Amino acid sequence: MNILDKESGITKLISQSQVNESEKDWHHTVLSDVGFRLDHIDFPCVFSKRAFKKKLIKFIFVENVEASGIQHLAEGLKDYVELSKNWNGDLNTAYPLIVAFSLEAINAQSVSDYHSFGWEVLQKLHEIDPEPWSEGVSTDPNSPAWCMCFDGMQLFCNMSSPANKFRRSRNLGKHFIMVINPRERFDIVAGNTPDGRKIRTNIRNRIDKYDEIPRSLQLGTYGTEALEWQQYGLLDENVKREDKCPFMFKKK
């Protein structure tokens, strides 16, 4: 899908192949950094590795987080949701989304700084979401039944930052990146079935091998005691989480 912003001429949602045609140097840097990591034989997420190899990844590049930048992201995300509806279960049509932010869009030094920025973005998206919160999904981040929703779709938002030094699987290069997938897709490919549990175990064993520290204490599956919001932004150390989710649900 190739959606053009008529005012700026910038493509909102672009394919992996189209990134090479971009006139923005930082877009090429993002693609190169992501590719360098996903091409590593030990990178834990086998689905991301496969998607990159097959050029299935979609991209949204965000220049700023002012109103114009958030609107640009929201419109691209709406296109991604439309693309992802009625998925047929074929991994060849499972398109992960990488949302990359320019270095000028963010002033952060620590993992917590980057996470705060990520939650600010998700909050702003929620506040301009054109659709009601997804039915059956809790509006309380401290509920196991909560996840981020936008345009009527449940989403999982993986925050990756250059400040993640030990948790290498959450560092995709110089830029802050959100890797977004429809949450319910995980129920299909890695759900609570014998095959799904085997896939999750394999990926988490790969995390232990790839990262400089053991897998996060907060990892889990949706609907269990593990909270989704804590898994969006994993700390660079294994400690009990005492912080609160900054996301606040707003009634329409």
Residue ranges, per PLM feature:
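Compact mixed alphabeta submodule
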Residues: 163-205
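Active-site ExK catalytic segment of metal-dependent nucleases
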Residues: 60-63, 118, 158-160, 179-181
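Structured loops at beta-to-helix junctions and adjacent beta-edge loops in soluble globular domains
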Residues: 102, 151, 158-160, 181-183, ...
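Short, flexible beta-strand-to-coil junctions
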Residues: 91-95, 99-107, 162, 183-185
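Aromatic/basic-lined ligand-recognition segments
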Residues: 136-174
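Short, charged/polar micro-motifs that form catalytic or ligand-binding hotspots
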Residues: 63, 67, 99-112, 143
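Non-catalytic accessory regions used for complex assembly or targeting
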Residues: 1-92, 106, 116-132, 190-252
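"Short basic amphipathic alpha-helical interaction patches in structured regions
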Residues: 111-118, 170-176
